[in-house]
């Protein structure tokens, strides 16, 4: 899959693959509290296009931003970084 220009990429863990050609990933990030200066983990779920249905639950994947593919899908899977055990 070719990348057109610079697109945002994120890394996440697959939490659901029950839909056809669609997976749901959970991406975490660290956020610093403005007053207490403590880092906390925030997470968000994204629906991602998986053209070949090759992801399993627990896989770590890298996804890139793309054009809107449906009402909720704006991300496309680039590659699987680590397989689930």
Curated annotation (Swiss-Prot):
Q: Name one GO molecular function term.
A: structural constituent of ribosome
Assembly mode? Part of the 30S ribosomal subunit.
Protein task: One of the primary rRNA binding proteins, it binds specifically to the 5'-end of 16S ribosomal RNA.
Note the Pfam families from the entry: Ribosomal_S17
GO CC aspect terms: cytosolic small ribosomal subunit
Recorded hits in Gene3D superfamilies, A to Z, give: Nucleic acid-binding proteins (2.40.50.140)
Protein family according to the UniProt entry: Belongs to the universal ribosomal protein uS17 family.
**What's in the keyword line of the UniProt record?**
Ribonucleoprotein, Ribosomal protein, RNA-binding, rRNA-binding
Check the record and name the CDD domains matching this protein: Ribosomal_uS17 (cd00364)
GO biological process, any: translation
Q: What is the lineage of its organism?
A: Bacteria, Pseudomonadati, Thermodesulfobacteriota, Syntrophia, Syntrophales
Report the protein name in the record: Small ribosomal subunit protein uS17
């Amino acid at each position: 899959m070719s990348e057109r220009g610079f697109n945002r990429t994120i890394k996440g863990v697959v939490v659901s693959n029950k839909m056809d050609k669609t997976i749901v990933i959970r991406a975490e990030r660290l956020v610093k509290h403005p007053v207490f200066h403590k880092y906390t983990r925030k997470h968000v779920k994204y629906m991602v296009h998986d053209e070949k249905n090759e992801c399993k639950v627990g896989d770590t994947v890298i996804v890139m931003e793309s054009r809107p593919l449906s009402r909720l899908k704006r991300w496309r899977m680039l590659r699987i970084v680590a397989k689930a055990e």
